[in-house]
Amino acid sequence: MAVPSVVKFKKDGVEYTSKVDRTKYLLSELIRAALKDTGRYVCRMTRKQIRRRTGRLAKNTQYWVRRKRQDLQVGFKPGGWYGMYQELGTEKKPKIGALKNAVMLNLDEIRRIQGQYLSVIEDENRAMNLIDEAEEQGQ
């Protein structure tokens, strides 16, 4: 989706310039970009913990940033169906909890990543440089 243009209209001889659509777009894209970077970081930390035991589950770890709900999901793709057994544990195997540990042990780093995007809200030009529309698929 392209950046909405500025809307100009005249009313009673006064020209108004509205950047509401552009600002709404900018905020939503900054949120998405922050969530994508957070998801990328959490997946990387999860893969480091999983890779010690097996290699296949690490390849099936992925993140999804949903556009309408504007939230982040980190989980295992269908090829890593057994990942929930390692995450939660079974009767015979203790839980590893790689996803949970990746988030809980790195809360400061996650806050720092998202804080980068929040601090850019004041400057529109810097915000536009951070948003990368070509990058749509998570890994």
What are these regions (language model features)?
Residues M1-Q139:
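Short, Lys/Arg-rich flexible segments
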